[in-house]
UniProtKB/Swiss-Prot annotation:
GO biological process: lactose catabolic process
Similarity comment: family membership: Belongs to the glycosyl hydrolase 2 family.
HAMAP family listed in its UniProt record: Beta_gal
Name this protein carries in UniProt: Beta-galactosidase
A single cellular component GO annotation: beta-galactosidase complex
Domain of life assignment: Bacteria
Organism per entry: Escherichia coli O157:H7
Site (Transition state stabilizer): 358, 392
Gene for this chain: lacZ
Signal peptide: none
Assembly notes: Homotetramer.
Recorded GO MF terms: beta-galactosidase activity; carbohydrate binding; magnesium ion binding
Length: 1024
């Protein structure tokens, strides 16, 4: 044990937080979570242990601008100005100091290992009682599951120890410091330490005791570590549970270890042995360790599909059976290996349907409770995710237990990222930083290796490739050969990774960056000598309105066996709740707390909002990742299961044939599909169609019974096919009255019954419509070629740092946003049964023509206005965002009804999850409330739109809301938007894709760009 004087002044003088060689003082060795049961039945059933006591709750807290400002008296008693805060928490979420959001740039001046003298310091204290029985025998430990970023600990005025690495536990022996009755803890937490240079993750930088604190009482002679592993024969019909147990204390001949394996109430196997292992070298073996092997016949295998859980109970007792203590853990029988270029689980190649997940809560910062963790797991399971990467640090210990039990594959990642270093491997190639890196990797493995859900270890994130990585890779492979190791840094395919694990590599496009080229994922597989599997550690950057092109990845994953999936970036938007002057909550991002440096809204890349409300993109991910695939041939549907281990036993296939959204026939068939098997379903003959319209077949896979992660009726998969467009003859309608044209110096006015249309002869636009005496338009109907930029359109552009390659900057530079219409033609003609208005506009900027738009408006006796639009795009202008029409309608109706793709927002490169049907939603649901306002709410493939008294027909895309594109473009936060008068309608003949391979470079695939020189579309606008 390190002995340091109790004086605060001496501790401050040592400056342990600026010494990379000091990662801890007096911290106990890492191990799996302990509870020290004194009853084996309680250990088996995982009941609360009387030896494990939570210290969560209200603590006294004082904040200081630097550790030197802390008075010595604080070690002995609470300060008069102390506040009360809840532990666990981040102090920034209680109004102390400010959270800082930055992605790459360090929030402090880069001068490792030194940190600023202005180093915000939180002083926590707690008074608690200890029963004398805990002091008479045994060892009392204190466990801090997470403290950011470093801390010194005192107990009853005496210095105990020091710890850093904010994402792993720090555990200390308090036995020598405690007294019976009242005791006082004092914890001095520093915001910055040399460890901060290894924690440069893309996240909010927060501080404090943000995970659980607990006391644990262990006997003097105790279990100090145990490790379980599962071994199999070739066909997995027999297994061995291998348990290695280590003890601490007096080694007596009478000591025994019993390991029992349970499945529910049934004991499957048991074994007992004294301590002492096999001979290791010429000096012998470990006297304080023992390894037992338990044979298990026909084990029920663990997988994310069927997470069969056993329970292993480890008992330390005397030869006569007197129990000293018991520890326990969940066990999953499973094998992970790489063979022939494939990552295998239980002998079958995995397809990773993964997502990255930060520990984030909009109200509580980085504090995770069980409810939030379960909510995240249910979201993943319900949306067909089977894997999660703990980006970029070990998670709360409970997370892994929940993943074991619900069934998720976990990449457990060390708390190492040096993204802001130049070069990035400046620290990871420096032997002075090897001790700190070693602690972060080895202690993660020692804590989490008993969890079956952990199938891959990760050495960290974005830290270049250094010799320290190679050393730690070899250590893991030596200590735990049962799992692969991955690491992306240095090019994603270095000697420190068993898996090619690039981030944001594209399907077909190479990105030949210097030193670390990012090949297309297809090309990577074919590089000479390369035989590793490829799993993208990050892909499909889900920032704002994104995830375009997601289907392209999944087509490749299913086509090439060694492309074994990836992890979407990421699950949850990292916005935080702030309150305005009236106490109303709003969502904040980088810079909103006065934090500098900051990376603005780049913290919001989630498939769900911070409150876990889904983004529309989540449905696209769910659909592409679904475990059932479908093929239609005539009236035969072939259903293929992508489950590797699960026979469908809770699925019904519902099918519906509908004509323009009106069901004609339907049925349901139970699915009985073996793992990786097929089922063929024959549909009945369909009735002869008498009506015109689009005929669609839709299938849904429904779970009739609830599961651990879904309610009854959950839809797990779906597909839709367009069967035909019925073109039966429509009888001519009766003759109508002929609309009347009136021409004035300023307008063309067309009247029919109680309707009027007015075209301004100076602008050439439809300037007004009347139904009776009610005006229908607040702004004219005009061309629209722009959109409120998406995050993907903006890229890395900022007001002070323009990226000329970003779509929005190209559009701005070309004048798309500033273009004005020059009228070239505006004529009116009376036909035999209609009035025809013809207009031609040149959309210009600074004398240059960007677009020419030719439109005809044919208003006939039925009151229909048929609009035909032809647009020419200048060859030297950037591809436009959209080609369409926009206006502000006077009405605000409650609901929107349309026949087209829905119900969720969809875009040309993100619409595979949308279904063609007749949809009806509240107007408010047509707007997607992205925290950073942008273009949103598009619905593609629309044949008919009904809103208020109006109907539009054709083949178009539309969005409709109370917010104009201009307001969306000019507003920084959604809570600052105000509902405008009337309703804004955008009808597009064509709309560019949204992209999403990443959010910092143009990523819209060529096939979804508006690259043609001419465009033609048409629609009919009438009143119902």
């Amino acid at each position: 044990m390190t002995m340091i004087t109790d004086s605060l002044a001496v501790v401050l003088q040592r400056r342990d937080w600026e010494n990379p060689g000091v990662t801890q003082l007096n911290r106990l060795a890492a191990h799996p979570p302990f509870a020290s049961w004194r009853n084996s039945e309680e250990a088996r059933t995982n009941r609360p242990s009387q030896q494990l006591r939570s210290l969560n709750g209200e603590w006294q807290f004082v904040w200081f601008p630097a550790p030197e400002a802390v008075p010595e008296s604080w070690l002995e008693c609470d300060l008069p100005d102390a506040d009360t805060v809840v532990v666990p928490s981040n102090w920034q979420m209680h109004g102390y100091d400010a959270p800082i959001y930055t992605n790459v740039t360090y929030p402090i001046t880069v001068n490792p290992p030194f940190v600023p003298t202005e180093n915000p310091t939180g002083c926590y204290s707690l008074t608690f009682n200890v029963d004398e029985s805990w002091l008479q025998e045994g060892q009392t430990r204190i466990i801090f599951d997470g403290v950011n970023s470093a801390f010194h600990l005192w107990c009853n005025g005496r210095w105990v120890g020091y710890g850093q690495d904010s994402r792993l536990l720090s555990e200390f022996d308090l036995s020598a410091f405690l007294r019976a009755g009242e005791n006082r803890l004092a914890v001095m937490v520093l915001r910055w330490s040399d460890g901060s240079y290894l924690e440069d993750q893309d996240m909010w930088r927060m501080s404090g005791i943000f995970r659980d604190v607990s006391l644990l009482h262990k006997p003097t002679t105790q279990i100090s570590d145990f490790h379980v592993a599962t071994l199999f024969n070739d066909d997995f019909s027999r297994a061995v549970l291998e348990a290695e147990v280590q003890m601490y204390g007096e080694l007596r001949d009478e000591l025994r270890v019993t390991v029992s394996l349970w499945q529910g109430e049934t004991q499957v196997a048991s074994g007992t042995a004294p301590f002492g292992g096999e001979i290791i070298d010429e000096r012998g073996g470990y006297a304080d360790r023992v390894t037992l092997g338990l044979n298990v016949e026909n084990p029920k295998l663990w997988s994310a599909e069927i997470p069969n859980i056993y329970r292993a109970v480890v008992e330390l007792h005397t030869a006569d059976g007197t129990l000293i203590e018991a520890e326990a853990c969940d066990v999953g029988f499973r094998e992970v290996r790489i063979e022939n270029g494939l990552l295998l689980l239980n002998g079958k190649p995995l397809l990773i349907r993964g997502v990255n997940r930060h520990e984030h809560h909009p109200l509580h910062g980085q504090v995770m409770d069980e409810q939030t963790m379960v909510q995240d797991i249910l979201l993943m399971k319900q949306n067909n995710f089977n894997a999660v990467r703990c980006s970029h640090y070990p998670n709360h210990p409970l997370w892994y237990t929940l993943c074991d039990r619900y069934g998720l594959y976990v990449v457990d990642e060390a708390n190492i990222e040096t993204h802001g270093m130049v070069p990035m491997n400046r620290l990871t190639d420096d032997p002075r930083w090897l001790p700190a890196m070693s602690e972060r990797v080895t202690r993660m493995v020692q804590r989490d290796r008993n969890h079956p859900s952990v199938i891959i270890w990760s050495l960290g994130n974005e830290s270049g490739h250094g010799a320290n990585h190679d050393a730690l890779y070899r250590w893991i492979k030596s200590v735990d050969p049962s799992r692969p190791v991955q690491y992306e840094g240095g090019g994603a395919d270095t000697s420190a990774t068993d898996i090619i694990c690039p981030m944001y590599a594209r399907v077909d496009e190479d990105q030949p960056f210097p030193a670390v080229p990012k090949w297309s994922i297809k090309k990577w597989l074919s590089l000479p000598g390369e035989m590793r599997p490829l799993i993208l550690c990050e892909y499909a950057h889900a920032m704002g309105n994104s995830l375009g092109g997601f289907a392209k990845y999944w087509q490749a994953f299913r086509q090439y066996p060694r492309l074994q999936g990836g992890f979407v970036w990421d699950l949850v938007d990292q916005s935080l709740i702030k309150y305005d002057e009236n106490g109303n909550p709003w969502s904040a991002y980088g810079g909103d707390f006065g934090d500098t440096p900051n990376d603005r809204q780049f913290c919001m890349n989630g498939l769900v909002f911070a409150d876990r409300t889904p983004h529309p993109a989540l449905t696209e991910a769910k659909h592409q990742q679904q475990f059932f695939q479908f093929r239609l041939s005539g009236r035969t549907i072939e259903v293929t299961s992508e489950y590797l281990f699960r026979h469908s036993d809770n699925e019904l296939l519902h099918w519906t044939v509908a004509l323009d959204g009106k069901p004609l026939a339907s049925g349901e068939v139970p699915l009985d599909v073996a793992p990786q098997g097929k089922q063929v379903i024959e549909l009945p003959e369909l009735p002869r169609l008498e009506s015109t319209g689009q005929l669609w077949l839709t299938v849904h896979v429904v779970q009739p019974n609830a599961t651990a992660w879904s309610e009854a009726g959950h839809i797990s998969a779906w597909q839709q096919w367009r069967l035909a467009e019925n073109l039966s003859v429509t009888l001519p309608s009766a003759p109508h009255a002929i609309p009347q044209l009136t021409t004035s110096e300023t307008d063309f006015c067309i009247e029919l019954d109680n309707k009027r249309w007015q075209f301004n002869r100076q602008s050439g636009f439809l300037s007004q419509m009347w139904i009776g005496d009610k005006k229908q338009l607040l702004t004219p109907l005009r061309d629209q070629f722009t959109r409120a930029p998406l995050d993907n359109d903006i890229g890395v552009s900022e007001a002070t740092r323009i990226d000329p390659n970003a779509w929005v900057e190209r559009w701005k530079a070309a004048g798309h946003y500033q273009a004005e219409a020059a009228l070239l033609q505006c004529t009116a003609d009376t036909l035999a049964d209609a009035v025809l208005i013809t207009t031609v506009h040149a959309w210009q900027h600074q004398g240059k023509t960007l677009f020419i738009s030719r439109k005809t408006y044919r208003i006939d006796g039925s009151g229909q206005m048929a609009i035909t639009v032809d647009v020419e795009v200048a060859s030297d202008t950037p591809h436009p965002a959209r080609i369409g029409l926009t206006c502000q309608l006077a009405q605000v109706a409650e609901r929107v009804n349309w026949l087209g793709l829905g119900p969720q927002e969809n875009y040309p490169d993100r619409l595979t999850a949308a279904c063609f049907d007749r949809w009806d939603l509240p107007l408010s649901d047509m707007y997607t409330p992205y925290v950073f306002p942008s273009e949103n709410g598009l619905r593609c493939g629309t044949r008919e739109l009904n809103y208020g008294p109006h109907q539009w027909r054709g083949d178009f895309q539309f969005n409709i809301s109370r917010y104009s594109q201009q307001q969306l473009m000019e507003t920084s936060h959604r809570h600052l938007l105000h509902a405008e008068e009337g309703t804004w309608l955008n009808i597009d003949g064509f709309h560019m894709g949204i992209g999403g391979d990443d959010s910092w470079s143009p990523s819209v695939s060529a096939e979804f760009q508006l690259s043609a020189g001419r465009y033609h579309y048409q629609l009919v606008w009438c009143q119902k």
